[in-house]
Amino acid sequence: MESILMQFSLFGLICIIKFRKVMDRLTCLSWWIWLILGITNLTCALCVKYVGLYSLILALFLIAYDYWNLIPRKTLSNTILCIHLMIRILIILSVICTVYLTVFYIHLTILSKAGPHDSVMTSAFQASLDGGLASITKGQPLEVTHGSQITLRHTYGRACWLHSHSHMYPLRYPDGRGSSHQQQVTCYSFKDVNNWWIVKKPERNDLVVTTPSEPIKHGDIIQLVHGITSRALNSHDVAAPMTPQSQEVSCYIDYNVSMPAQNFWKVEVTNKDNTGDVWHAIQSQIRLIHVNTDYALKFSGRQLPDWGFNQHEVVADRLVDQTDSIWNVEEHRYTKSEDQKQRERELINAEMIPLQATTLSFWEKFVELQIKMLFSGQEGQNSHMYSSDPLDWPLMSRGIAYWVSNDSNVNMY
């Protein structure tokens, strides 16, 4: 990728250098050719990697500098100078927008099939691709109702699913803090049967979808029952293991102690202006607000230690309006049996019947892809002993390991 980037960047800068030699000859054909070729190639470099923006900025600086030098020339009237300026701006903006949008339009049109790395995109984006997630989500019910079996995906940032298993939080953490010793709730980065939850209305005692169904709407109060362990999603005034300023999230176990269940959650559909008040699979982006505390269910980004199987921490946070508190239903089916063992078999063995794919417009895909290109490189970058911050660079307060001996501890900074 770097070789392609360098090719476009170097050829683009060469064209701009050629343009500088004829910068005052607006009626000359070479003036137009070199400017358009230069901006086209530098925009292609930007399409390859965002670091190509630096080459484009350099070219724009040279063009602006040359125009500044044209202003004192007595042979050029104010009208001619204004024409020079307007044509430069028009060509630069139109070429950049046309080339950039065309490249990504071709990219998104041709690459219509699922691949091994599409999990970084949102569920809606994945479901619009042929194969992969689309083959699972096609044909599944749209409206989330009482009795729906769902997987909840963290919508933005790291791809992971709300998860629980039969293991408990440790009684005490290494820093001396105590936990609730309730069932762990995490965000797991892989598909797993323990990612399934059942939506339940508090006033109902069964978990079966009835006819007519009871769709969940914006503002409704629900319980989330873990599909395998049958314990409800819960939060309470106990510090989270890795983020003590937030509340712990667990699945409630009744130990007959003075810690009653607080397992009611309010559904907030954040994009209801586009999808409506009813909670929809794939399309609706939701927040789950803990009724007792008004805290939001949130992916904290912290990784749990060995006792949490190195999965990611889920907390309840008082700051509701943040992207890490947004979730969406990815896989969805209706519960048909009240028997727990039968439900477990359905969760493990069920397959959806493909009917039609989720569709996204070009602009929806384009915007999401740009956001992922900007921020996905920051995900999964863990701190290590040789890491440094930009403020360390000019002061040289931290060293960089250039060479380490394989036979001894000798190293060079």
Give the positions of each predicted feature.
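Residue-level signature of transmembrane alpha-helical entry/exit and packing/kink sites
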Residues: E2, W31-G38, H84, R88, ...
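Transmembrane helices and adjacent periplasmic/lumenal helix-loop junctions
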Residues: S3, I36-I63, T98
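Specific aromatic-rich, kink-prone transmembrane helix
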Residues: I4-T27, W34, G38-N41, D66
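Hydrophobic membrane-targeting alpha-helices
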Residues: C15-F19, C47, L56, L60-A64, ...
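Juxtamembrane interfacial secondary-structure elements that flank transmembrane helices
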Residues: M23-D24, Y67-P72, Y105-H117
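Hydrophobic alpha-helical membrane-interfacial segments at the cytosolic entry of transmembrane helices
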Residues: T40-N41, I63, K74-I106
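Lectin-like carbohydrate-binding module/patch detector with strong preference for beta-trefoil
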Residues: L108-E368
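Membrane-interface anchor segments at the N-terminal boundary of transmembrane helices
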Residues: M385-S388, I400-Y413
